Amino acid sequence: MGTEKTQPLTLICHGESPKFYEIDFDLDGLRVHHFNPDIEWAMFVAWNRRVIPERFRSHYDEKFLPIARSSDVIAGKIANDRMVVVLDWFFNGFITDVGLLMSLQALGLGDQYCALTPEACSHAKVVSEKALSANECANLRAKSENQRSLAVKMVDRIRLEHRRDGIFFSEIIEQETGRAWT
């Protein structure tokens, strides 16, 4: 669930019989942890995607499990098909934290919400449902590819402009855990 309508549309357009659901998600009474668009958010994404090497996992388990266990909803910037390229570059040492954060800001992503508990799920109500035609899906796929291409060019420019600014993913892990990467 998210605030940016295009994000789920470009994902579902690859399915056989895609349907788009508009959802009303009432957060009142729920325990919501909202990640700011910062390095903690990126490290949470890395932890969830199991990108953090196993030898460092326990540190991040101690950091993020309490957040996940005490929340009905986790919210943060959408890690969509445009952002996944940037995240991969960050996780693989092609850009620093400065490049990542500048890219995150430049991409202008909406927020996404993950309902973690039955209570949170009960707060989500389907408002409308729309089946997508083959033509709509083709247009969405083309739009998605175009957006991804433009995003990669923009992020590559940011990467080059800030290649000496900040620290890399492995260095963040070293600093946070007090252990050497190698």
Predicted regions and their residues:
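Conserved NAD+-utilizing ADP-ribose enzyme module
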Residues: H14-K19, L27-T182
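Extended catalytic/binding region for NAD+/ADP-ribose chemistry, centered on the ART fold
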Residues: M1-C13
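Surface-exposed, glycine/proline- and aromatic-rich loop segments on solvent-exposed faces
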Residues: E22
